[in-house]
UniProtKB/Swiss-Prot annotation:
Keywords: ATP-binding, Nucleotide-binding, Nucleotidyltransferase, RNA-directed RNA polymerase, Transferase. It comes from Physalis mottle virus (PhMV). It catalyses: RNA(n) + a ribonucleoside 5'-triphosphate = RNA(n+1) + diphosphate. Its EC number is 2.7.7.48. Belongs to the tymovirus NS35 RNA replicase polyprotein family. GO terms for molecular function: ATP binding; RNA-directed RNA polymerase activity. This is RNA replicase polyprotein. SUPFAM superfamilies: DNA/RNA polymerases. It comes from the Viruses.
């Protein structure tokens, strides 16, 4: 999905006949891709679909298992702030509000941190780091220096992927996630 009309590369005439692609062009004010509305400001989870998922998990009582996943999905768009109203079709604003209200009523204070644009306090991150055994590169890069140093000091594995133990753990994670 490309939001907006991209400029045509000066190389296009030379390579277009080498490609066997057919581009699907759709002009819309609210492009939807894989359940997310896309905009120049960012993406927003389709609030109607999200609301339906929330109500289904309330009905089948699976909310505790799914709440963090669903909260993460909605927090992406929520963190756009007031811009969200400009980039959603008007009939979906009420569902976005309903999802936000649902999370405000049903999430713990620590879960609600996902809905905040403020940085997570360093004290909370440091407390969290003492409990985890593994951190993704993206998460690690967002941590304050003290937390990164602590994780490195408690790690018994070298920080390079050629280590057989690291490869073994990664393969176990892959099987676990499938």
């Amino acid at each position: 999905v490309i939001v907006g009309t991209p400029p045509i590369s000066p190389n296009w005439p030379a390579i277009k006949d080498l490609l066997h692609l057919k581009f699907k062009t759709e002009i819309t004010s609210s492009p939807l891709f894989c359940g997310y509305y896309l905009s120049p400001a960012g993406c927003i989870r389709n609030p109607l679909a999200h609301f339906a998922k929330l109500m289904t998990c309330v009905d089948d009582m699976s909310l505790p298992e799914k709440v963090l996943s669903y909260l993460s999905e909605v927090s992406i768009g929520h963190n756009l702030g007031d811009q969200i109203i400009q980039h959603l079709p008007p009939h979906l604003i009420q569902y976005q509000s309903a999802c936000f209200d649902f999370f405000c009523r049903n999430c713990t204070p620590s879960q609600k941190l996902l809905l905040s644009n403020d940085p997570i306090p360093e004290s909370k991150l440091l407390a969290l780091v003492h409990k985890i055994k593994w951190a993704s590169k993206a998460f690690f890069s967002e941590l304050p220096q003290k937390a990164r140093e602590f994780l490195v000091s408690k790690s018994s594995l070298p920080s390079f992927p050629n280590n057989p133990k690291v490869s073994e753990l990664e393969s176990e994670l892959l099987h676990f996630s499938q």
